[in-house]
Amino acid sequence: MKRNKLRELLNEGKPTLGTHVITPWPGIVEVIGHSGAFDYIEYIGEYSAFSLEQLENFGRAIELFPNMSSMMKVEEQGRGHIATRSLDAGIQNVLFTDCRSAEDVRECIRFIRSETPEAGGVHGFSSRRISLGSNAVEWVKMMNDTVIAIMIEKKGAVEN
């Protein structure tokens, strides 16, 4: 199980430094990873085209760098599907956009957290690449360690 450096730094109360990319090309991940300058790389899926295969290759490239985590910026439409498939591909953290209410935020959290009584989520155990070689306990820990970021950008989100 790959360590989630972003989660570790946040848990320690330390600052983080990330960068954004608008392409899922693994070569970009490798260039950024070899720089050693960033704690995480955020793929801005909200504004670019990608396939599920490209997400998996992005996740594979991230695994080359134990000191760098990853994040997927997810748009409003289809966010549950995109977020869970990103995690299952190996992207460790998720940034949700366009939340308009506290209920929207709670829904985003449910998408990520495992479907256990303790976690209260709806994300079932994955039989995809990220969980291969992991057991259910490790997988639940991965989902609990996922940083769930919420972009507050809509008037309703500020008011609610």
Predicted regions and their residues:
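Expand to "…catalyze enediolate/carbanion chemistry for C-C bond making/breaking, isomerization
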Residues: 1-160
